[in-house]
Amino acid sequence: IMAEQDLRENPFRDEIYTYLLDHGYCAGERSDYDYAHALDTGKLFAFLEATQPEELNKLKATYGDRYQSRYIDLLCQKIDNRGLLTALNEWVEDYASGTKFQIAYFKSSIKSMSEGLALYEKNIFSIRREFTFEQKKDPYRVDLAIFLNGIPIVMIELKKQTAGQKASFEGTKQFRMTRN
């Protein structure tokens, strides 16, 4: 555990990061991040392969090499139209291929306990530290980002009280004024 007197932001960030890795989270890889769509496509398609391979094969049969871009477009449309929280609980559907994908599995939506719990446990939680979410010379970054199945669900910006920063002001201002 972090020493009490060490109140800097980086050791605290690293402590959170290490704790989550030690408790089942995966490390996110920069190379898997799709900046244009704000998704970790590596974790996204790993989740789909692990939980819905038949549906994914139908999508591949319909779209060939473009199946990933088609799914990403459908997912982004769903999130844009319905909002992230609603989208996480609904299906992503492609009518041309006749496919329906669950974005995540929740304990409350489990139909059959054994099968449902197995699917729930295949959710992929990942974490990135010093996460830059845009490609430009001086990109915005957050201290930590948490993803569920490749979808960013939590951004954490740590503040140091000893440096005069206040999370209620500095963090809020930073997210409202300097983030897209």
Regions found by a protein language model. Give the residues of each.
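An alpha-helical interface "stripe"
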Residues: 2-180
